[in-house]
């Protein structure tokens, strides 16, 4: 009987901790939203974005690997935020990481912001648009050694491509 009581207590304590964590994350998200230059309601974002773009940019979702139209794009130009049009990555920074997501070895400085993400149980560096706060992806330290050593693993749904003028 003591065993069952202990198990129930452990489960109850675990649920309480998760509930408090979610509240803290929500408060943090609200604070971050106030800091962005482009702020829109959820309804406004839904009207402007596709379902997948909304899921990735506004709900910090992840598109399926290999599904991005930009994965094999070799054209010269700039990748901009699909939410607000802020230039984020230049095509010259793009490389084939073999991960299934568009990858870049660096961002356009000042236009991408970083935060810590523990959503899957361990620490990762999340990237988001510095202007509208849209979730872009994550940055890892396993990129090309001959450049920055970084791999910005980006959801193609978070991007639009603007070809270089010829």
Task: Walk through the language-model features, giving the residues of each.
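Bacterial Sec-dependent N-terminal signal peptides
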Residues: 1-25
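Alpha-helical interaction segments
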Residues: 4-6, 34-36, 44, 91-94
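Sec-dependent signal peptide cleavage junction
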Residues: 17-44
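A short Gly-Trp-Pro
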Residues: 46-80, 86-166
């Amino acid at each position: 009987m003591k065993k069952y009581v202990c198990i129930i207590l452990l489960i109850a304590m675990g649920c309480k901790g998760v509930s408090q964590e979610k509240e803290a994350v929500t408060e943090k998200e609200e604070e971050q939203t106030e800091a962005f230059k482009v702020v829109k309601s959820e309804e406004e974002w839904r009207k402007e974005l596709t379902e997948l773009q909304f899921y990735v940019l506004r709900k910090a979702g992840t598109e399926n690997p290999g599904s991005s139209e930009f994965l094999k794009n070799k054209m010269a130009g700039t990748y901009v935020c699909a939410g607000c049009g802020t230039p984020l990555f230049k095509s010259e920074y793009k490389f084939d990481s073999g991960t299934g997501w568009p990858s870049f070895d660096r961002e356009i400085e000042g236009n991408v912001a970083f935060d810590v993400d523990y959503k899957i149980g361990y620490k990762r560096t999340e990237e988001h648009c510095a202007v509208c706060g849209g979730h872009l992806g994550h940055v890892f330290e396993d990129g090309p050694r001959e450049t920055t050593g970084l791999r910005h693993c980006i959801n193609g749904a978070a991007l639009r491509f603007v070809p270089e003028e010829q």
